[in-house]
Curated annotation (Swiss-Prot):
Top-rank taxon, per record: Bacteria
Self-association state and partner proteins as the record states: Part of the 30S ribosomal subunit. Contacts proteins S5 and S12.
Alphabetical list of InterPro entries matching this protein: Ribosomal_uS8, Ribosomal_uS8_CS, Ribosomal_uS8_sf
Assigned protein family: Belongs to the universal ribosomal protein uS8 family.
Organism expressing this protein natively: Deinococcus geothermalis (strain DSM 11300 / CIP 105573 / AG-3a)
GO biological processes: translation
NCBIfam families: PRK00136.1 (NF001109)
GO molecular function, one term: rRNA binding
Protein name, as recorded: Small ribosomal subunit protein uS8
Length: 133
């Protein structure tokens, strides 16, 4: 059993990107699906779909990865910030600016998962789930 399924998801994406895979399958949950859809909206992955493979009991998220024109990785760095053993909560004023605004911090707020820019704009803080650039 995994103690941190979000860290597992981010690790699978990181490993698949470094191996130049077309897509990666991840055990599905609502939170993971919301996180994947946010990555699609922000342009870090090409697509996400929820599937139930034949003969399986549980759904799977298939995340289609995205690469540049010369196969350069769109996601150069992805890391978990708030972990089960050390939660990271921040106010709207203290939200991190990743790579001076060129990266993305994903924040779990009372209004759902938001990129750091939107959370700052709406004036809400929350738990910093991960950062990527």
């Amino acid at each position: 059993m995994l103690s941190d399924p979000i860290a597992d998801m981010l690790t699978r994406i990181r490993n698949a990107t470094r191996a130049y895979k077309e897509s990666v399958d991840i055990p599905a949950s609502k939170f993971k699906e919301e996180l994947a859809k946010l990555l699609v909206r922000e342009g870090y992955v090409a697509g996400v779909e929820r599937l139930r493979p034949e003969g399986q009991k549980f759904d799977v998220l298939r995340i289609t990865l995205k690469y540049g024109q010369k196969r350069e990785q769109v996601i150069k760095h992805i890391e978990r910030v708030s972990r089960p053993g050390r939660r990271a909560y921040v106010s709207a004023e203290n939200l991190p600016r990743v790579q001076r605004g060129l990266g993305l911090a994903v924040v779990s707020t009372s209004k759902g998962l938001l990129p750091d820019r939107e959370a700052r704009k709406q004036g809400v803080g929350g738990e910093v789930v991960c950062i990527l650039w």
